[in-house]
């Protein structure tokens, strides 16, 4: 039975009670974007967009940490922060490329589309990794109130979510908005528990399969009996091994940082080391705030006990240093609490996944080496893998025994340095895919026209000679063209380097050099699209396009003939107006349209027409 856990006999030879997979997920229902557990807990999950923290200036980093510390002070008592890595899902991007290819009229460009699609498929199936970040918190009832209504619970959780949105915006993070919050929560658990199946079977298809299986029971009320876990649980879960568990064709191992496994001092954003360790590495951070008054009392009591012990200990005894350090640490915590900081217990759980036991052991060894290089330590949760697995679920419910064993006491300032929403990714939705980030294997996709992310679309490509600046520019231009974005490249000295690219995409090459058949008609008038400006500033009064063009032509001629007199400028102005009038163009913008060909411009004059008008007048001949 795929729904029954496989467990090993205990040391006394007794089999552990058989338990179904449904029992592992204590989810009673999902409603209003809230998880209702079977233990009468109400869980809210928010997805957070990360920032590239390490590229920010020291001043900006301090600002982020201070804002995160402010968030911790007003957040619920128990928090879980989760980062989740998996193979990048490029299906949505591939669908967009296929639509662009279908709408492309040029057969040669469609061939380039097919090549681009194959490239994206290869990256998505082999190299690319995507990361998602979550914060999980639960409803915490006031101690002096009873009979709280469900509406009040929802309101409290929504208020907490708004606080996260406000303070995280100060950090530079945004909360991802989902059209259907209930479906989002289901997808989170489905993806976490079915790492292999979720790549091949989307959630919607899984939902249809579950509905079909219940309808096959010929029970009119079958759909009402479907538990939420039915859409999430993996096909199998093997718990027979002490060092790992096997779930949905993937091996999972769980490690934790012991209380003495941290460095004495860490820098802000140090968790970027773990978060960006690579594919198959997930990180869970648990924080639990303690009552300040009770902790002040306990710390003071422990200081007094240690001071009494150290009086009876010789300074040559090995215990003397331990007691001395404990006393100093106690005073440090006491001073911090007196300076308006809070006391927290923190624990970090690291999940390592792989397709085989060999790969799993290799990844465990590599992540341990990485931590040792930073003077930190990781311990495998041997024979506690099930408890660690349940702790890793986004339910803000770490196993009590594990949390007590591995927790570390910290203050607010230290907790803020655990800021987890750190990533090296540059992956913009609807951007042009450039490749894979070699530092953390994330996709590099750029959409510099996204006003939601960037203040403007300006971009600079810097590098040494031969580093690939021109190639990068060609790559961006090529893939923007494949995405249907018009691309213009002005290359005064390196135009020959773009010639082959333009020919391959059936582009137009314009050479502005002496003897070239191509030239620019400086007298051409084209209406400017003011749609974006009107959206920002409202409707603006219409201005004459001819008047604006005449002003620009005066600037043009003043550069050619700097010593024009006022009388000559007046004569030139009259000649320009006459030249446009001869083509039927007046100060009215409607005169720009060609009545013989609706939707097209009239034939525009050229400098030769202006020369003819000047030559025909006696005063300008």
Model feature map: region roles:
Residues 1-421:
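Extended, folded cores of ATP/NTP-driven motor/assembly subunits in large transport
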Residues 84, 475-577, 581, 585:
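Switch/coupling segment of Walker-type NTPase motor domains
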Residues 158-177, 433-442, 450-464, 476, ...:
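Charge-patterned, long linear interaction tracts outside catalytic cores
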Residues 228, 232, 236, 419-433, ...:
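Flexible, glycine/threonine-enriched loop-and-boundary segments that flank and lead into catalytic domains
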Residues 409-417, 424-441:
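Pre-P-loop entry segment of helicase/translocase ATPase cores
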Residues 429-513:
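Glycine-rich phosphate-binding loop of nucleotide-binding enzymes
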């Amino acid at each position: 039975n795929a729904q029954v856990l496989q467990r090993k006999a205990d040391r006394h030879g007794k089999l552990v009670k058989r338990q179904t997979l449904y029992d592992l997920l204590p989810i009673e229902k999902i409603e209003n974007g809230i998880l209702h557990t079977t233990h009468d807990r109400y869980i809210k999950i928010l997805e957070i967009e990360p920032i590239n923290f390490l590229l920010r200036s020291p001043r900006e980093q301090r600002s982020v940490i201070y804002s995160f510390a402010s968030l911790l002070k007003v957040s619920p008592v128990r928090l879980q922060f989760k980062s989740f890595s998996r193979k990048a899902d490029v299906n949505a991007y591939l669908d967009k490329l296929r639509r662009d290819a279908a709408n492309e009229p040029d057969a040669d460009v469609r061939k380039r589309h097919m090549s681009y699609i194959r490239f994206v498929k290869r990256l998505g199936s082999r190299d690319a990794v995507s990361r998602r970040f979550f914060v999980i918190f639960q409803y915490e009832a006031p101690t002096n109130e009873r009979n709280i209504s469900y509406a009040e619970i929802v309101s409290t959780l929504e208020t907490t979510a708004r606080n996260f949105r406000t303070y995280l915006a100060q950090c530079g993070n945004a909360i991802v908005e989902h059209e259907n919050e209930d479906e989002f929560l289901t997808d989170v658990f489905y993806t976490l528990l079915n790492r292999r199946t979720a790549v091949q079977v989307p959630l919607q298809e899984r939902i249809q399969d579950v509905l079909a299986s219940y309808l096959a029971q010929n029970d009119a009320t079958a759909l009402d009996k479907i538990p939420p876990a039915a859409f999430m649980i993996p096909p199998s879960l093997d718990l027979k091994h002490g060092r790992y568990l096997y779930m949905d064709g993937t091996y999972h191992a769980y490690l934790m940082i012991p209380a003495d496994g941290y460095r004495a001092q860490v820098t802000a954003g140090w968790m970027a080391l773990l978060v960006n360790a690579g594919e198959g590495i997930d990180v869970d951070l648990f924080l639990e705030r303690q009552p300040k008054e009770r902790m002040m009392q306990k710390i003071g009591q422990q200081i007094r006990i240690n001071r009494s012990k150290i009086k009876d200990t010789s300074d040559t005894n090995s215990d003397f240093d331990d007691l001395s350090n404990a006393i100093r640490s106690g005073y440090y915590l006491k001073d911090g609490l007196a300076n308006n900081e809070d006391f927290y217990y923190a624990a970090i759980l690291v999940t390592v996944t792989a397709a085989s036991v060999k790969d799993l052991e290799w990844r465990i060894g590599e992540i341990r080496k990485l931590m040792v290089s930073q003077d930190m330590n990781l311990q495998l949760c041997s024979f506690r893998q099930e408890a660690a697995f349940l702790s890793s679920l986004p339910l803000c419910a770490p196993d009590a025994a594990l949390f007590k064993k591995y927790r570390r006491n910290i203050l607010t300032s230290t907790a803020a340095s655990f800021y987890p929403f750190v990533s090296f990714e540059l992956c913009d939705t609807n951007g042009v895919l450039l490749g894979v980030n070699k530092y953390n294997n994330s996709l590099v996709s750029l959409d510099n026209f996204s006003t939601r992310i960037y203040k403007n679309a300006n971009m600079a490509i810097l590098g040494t000679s031969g580093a690939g600046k021109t190639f990068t520019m060609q790559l961006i231009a090529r893939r923007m063209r494949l995405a249907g974005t018009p691309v213009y490249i002005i290359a005064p000295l390196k135009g020959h380097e773009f010639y082959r690219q333009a020919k391959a995409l059936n582009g137009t090459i314009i050479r502005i050099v002496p003897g070239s058949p191509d030239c620019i008609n400086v007298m051409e008038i084209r209406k400017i699209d003011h749609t974006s400006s009107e959206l920002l500033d409202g409707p603006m009064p219409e201005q004459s396009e001819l008047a604006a063009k005449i002003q620009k032509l005066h600037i043009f001629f003043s550069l050619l003939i700097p010593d024009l007199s006022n009388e000559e400028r007046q004569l030139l102005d009259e000649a320009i107006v006459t030249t446009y009038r001869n083509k039927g163009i007046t100060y009215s913008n409607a005169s720009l349209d060609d009545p013989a060909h609706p939707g097209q411009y009239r034939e525009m004059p050229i400098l030769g027409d202006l020369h003819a008008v000047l030559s025909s007048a006696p005063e300008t001949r």
